[in-house]
C-alpha cells in the first residue's frame, strides 16, 4: 500500500496542476500500460496452465481427461467466485455496458483482477470460451477505477473505461486499430474527435506490451492467404449471407441453451456439474472444442483440416475428404453449445474467440465445398480468414472491428475488399433478424442499453430512486378533516398522500380540492379523509425505466406521480425534478 501511494502522489499533483485534457492523455498511457500487462498475464496464465496439464504422461492425449479438465476448471471458478467475490462476477461486455448506463461508469474494483484469474482458469482447463471479453472487462475496470480515484467526471471516466477496453483488445490480438474501433462501436455511443487520441494512445501502448513481452506463439496470426480476384466477389457475397445466417443461429442457440440452466440459477455447483459434464462429452466427440480453439483455426487457415480428426471418434474411418468436410461443418454448429455450456455452467469467458472459430470453419467449409464440387477454384485460406470477420461482425454487431481486426492479424490489407463485403453483408443480414447483439439483447429488453440517441441515452442513465421526493406529508387513511387541516398547516406542498397503517397508498388529496371545505370548522370532525381523496392519475413503480415514467407523465398530464414498491408508498416523483436532472446529465454526458 505505501508503494502504491508513492506513485499516486505525483499523479494527484498532475491532476491539480494540469488541464483535464492533458491529464486524460497521461492517464490513457497508464491505463493502456496496465490493461496491456493484464492481457499479457492472462495469456501467459492460460499457456502455463495448459503446459502444466500436458506435462508428465501427456494426459491430454487420454480422452477421459478431456472430460475431467473442463469440469474441474468450471468447478474451481465457481468456488473462487463464491469465496472471493461473494458469488458476483458480472460476465461479458454486457456487464460493462450496464455499468456505463446504470452505475455512472463505476466498475467494481475486484474486476481489475477477478476476470484475469477466473477466465485464465476456465480457458486453461479447456473451457470452450474466449479470453477477449474478460480482458475487455478487466481493462474497463482499470480505466473506470483510475477515473474514480482521481475524481474525473462521468464523461471522462467513461472515456478511460473505453481506453482500458481498447488496450485489452489491442494487446490480445496485437491489433491497435481494432481495439480503438471496438471501443467506439461497442462501448461508446457518443464519440467526439477529441476522444480518439486517448483511445489511440491506450491501444498502441497495450499492443506494444504484448508485442514486447509475449512470445509470438501466444498471439494469433493468419498468414497463409491467397490472392484476391474480382471473380471471387460473388462467392464472398454468398459467404457474407451464410455467415449472417450462422450468426443468427449462433445468437439464438446461445440464448436457448442458456435458458436450460435457469432452473439451476440458485444452485451454482449443480449448474457447474451439468455444464462441465455436457461440455466434456462434447469435447470427447469433438476434441478441437477444447480451449479457445485458435489451434483449430490455424490448421484450417494453413490447409490441414485432416489434423482436426486426430483423437476424434471419426479418426477410425480415415481421412476421407467428405468426412473431413462434414466434421468441419459439425464443429461450426456445436461450438456455440460448447461455449454456452462453459459460460452458463459458471466458467468465465466470452463469445469473441468462439465467433472467430465458427467463422473460420464456415469460411473453410464454404470454399472447400465449392472446390470439391468444382464450381470455382477458391483460396481456402482467404475464405477461412474472411469467414471469421463475417461471424464476428454478426454476433458482436461490430462490422468495423471485424474488418480491421482480421486485416491486422493477417498482416496487411490484401483482403480488405472481401473483408468489407462479407462483414457488411453479414451485419445487414443479422440486423434484419436480430436488432441487438448477443451481449446487448438482455440490456435492451430491460431498457438499460445506451444508444446514439442522446435523449434516450440520458433517460436510461437516470434512475427513479435518485428522483424520489419524500417531503410530502402523508395523511392517515382513517383521519378526519381536522387532522388533514393540521397536516396542511405544516406542509409546504399542495399534494398529500393517504396511507394506511401498513404504509400502503390508498389515494391522494389535492389542496385545490379541499380549499373550500377546510374553512368550515363545523365539518372538521364529521368529514373523513376517505370522502375527500381520489385515485392518482397513475403510479410509478420503483423499478420503472425513465422512458416508462415519462410516458406516464405524457399520458396523464400530471406534474407529480406517487412512487410505489409493490403497494408501499415511497414518495413522489415530479416532472420538474426530472427535467432539471435531465438537463444536468445532458451537460455531463455530452460536455455541452
What function would you assign to each model-found segment?
Residues 1-471, 475-496, 500-506, 566, ...:
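Alpha-helical transmembrane segments and immediately membrane-proximal extracytoplasmic
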Amino acid at each position: 500500500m505505501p508503494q502504491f501511494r508513492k506513485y499516486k502522489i505525483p499523479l494527484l499533483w498532475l491532476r491539480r496542476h494540469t488541464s483535464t485534457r492533458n491529464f486524460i492523455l497521461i492517464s490513457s498511457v497508464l491505463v493502456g500500460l496496465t490493461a496491456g500487462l493484464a492481457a499479457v498475464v492472462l495469456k501467459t496464465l492460460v499457456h502455463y496452465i495448459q503446459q502444466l496439464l500436458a506435462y508428465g504422461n501427456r494426459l491430454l492425449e487420454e480422452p477421459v481427461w478431456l472430460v475431467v479438465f473442463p469440469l474441474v476448471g468450471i468447478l474451481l471458478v465457481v468456488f473462487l467466485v463464491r469465496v472471493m467475490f461473494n458469488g458476483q462476477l458480472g460476465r461479458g461486455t454486457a456487464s460493462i455496458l450496464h455499468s456505463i448506463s446504470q452505475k455512472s461508469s463505476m466498475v467494481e474494483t475486484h474486476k481489475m483482477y477477478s476476470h484475469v484469474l477466473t477466465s485464465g482458469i476456465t480457458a486453461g482447463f479447456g473451457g470452450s470460451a474466449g479470453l477477449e471479453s474478460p480482458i475487455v472487462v478487466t481493462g474497463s475496470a482499470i480505466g473506470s477505477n483510475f477515473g474514480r480515484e482521481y475524481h474525473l467526471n462521468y464523461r471522462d471516466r467513461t472515456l478511460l473505461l473505453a481506453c482500458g477496453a481498447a488496450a485489452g483488445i489491442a494487446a490480445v490480438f496485437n491489433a491497435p486499430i481494432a481495439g480503438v474501433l471496438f471501443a467506439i462501436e461497442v462501448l461508446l455511443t457518443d464519440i467526439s474527435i477529441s476522444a480518439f487520441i486517448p483511445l489511440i494512445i491506450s491501444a498502441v501502448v497495450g499492443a506494444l506490451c504484448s508485442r514486447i513481452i509475449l512470445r509470438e506463439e501466444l498471439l494469433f496470426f493468419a498468414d497463409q492467404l491467397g490472392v484476391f480476384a474480382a471473380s471471387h466477389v460473388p462467392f464472398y457475397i454468398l459467404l457474407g449471407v451464410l455467415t449472417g445466417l450462422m450468426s443468427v443461429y449462433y445468437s439464438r442457440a446461445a440464448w436457448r441453451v442458456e435458458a436450460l440452466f435457469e432452473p439451476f440459477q440458485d444452485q451454482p455447483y449443480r449448474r457447474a456439474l451439468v455444464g462441465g459434464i455436457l461440455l466434456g462429452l462434447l469435447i470427447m466427440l469433438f476434441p478441437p472444442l477444447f480451449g479457445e480453439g485458435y489451434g483449430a483455426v490455424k490448421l484450417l487457415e494453413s490447409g490441414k483440416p485432416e489434423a482436426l480428426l486426430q483423437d476424434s471418434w471419426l479418426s477410425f474411418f480415415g481421412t476421407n475428404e467428405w468426412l473431413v468436410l462434414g466434421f468441419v461443418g459439425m464443429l461450426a454448429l456445436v461450438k456455440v453449445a460448447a461455449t454456452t455450456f462453459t459460460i452458463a455452467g459458471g466458467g468465465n469467458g466470452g463469445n469473441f474467440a468462439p465467433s472467430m472459430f465458427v467463422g473460420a470453419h464456415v469460411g473453410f467449409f464454404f470454399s472447400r465445398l465449392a472446390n470439391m464440387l468444382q464450381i470455382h477454384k477458391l483460396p481456402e485460406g482467404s475464405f477461412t480468414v474472411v469467414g471469421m470477420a463475417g461471424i464476428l461482425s454478426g454476433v458482436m454487431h461490430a462490422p468495423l472491428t471485424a474488418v480491421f481486426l482480421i486485416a491486422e492479424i493477417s498482416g496487411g490489407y490484401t483482403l480488405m475488399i472481401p473483408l468489407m463485403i462479407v462483414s457488411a453483408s453479414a451485419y445487414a443480414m443479422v440486423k434484419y433478424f436480430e436488432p441487438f447483439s448477443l451481449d446487448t439483447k438482455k440490456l435492451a429488453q430491460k431498457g438499460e442499453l445506451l444508444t446514439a440517441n442522446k435523449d434516450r441515452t440520458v433517460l436510461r442513465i437516470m434512475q427513479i430512486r435518485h428522483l424520489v421526493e419524500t417531503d410530502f406529508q402523508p395523511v392517515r387513511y382513517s383521519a378526519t378533516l381536522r387532522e388533514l387541516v393540521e397536516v396542511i398547516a405544516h406542509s409546504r406542498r399542495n399534494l398529500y398522500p393517504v396511507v394506511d397503517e401498513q404504509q400502503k397508498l390508498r389515494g391522494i388529496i389535492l389542496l385545490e380540492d379541499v380549499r373550500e371545505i377546510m374553512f368550515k370548522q363545523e365539518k372538521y370532525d364529521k368529514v373523513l379523509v376517505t370522502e375527500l381523496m381520489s385515485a392518482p392519475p397513475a403510479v410509478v413503480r420503483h423499478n420503472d425505466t425513465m422512458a416508462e415514467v415519462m410516458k406516464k407523465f405524457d399520458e396523464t398530464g400530471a406534474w407529480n406521480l406517487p412512487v410505489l414498491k409493490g403497494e408501499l408508498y415511497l414518495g413522489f416523483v415530479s416532472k420538474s425534478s426530472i427535467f432539471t436532472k435531465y438537463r444536468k446529465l445532458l451537460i455531463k454526458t455530452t460536455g455541452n
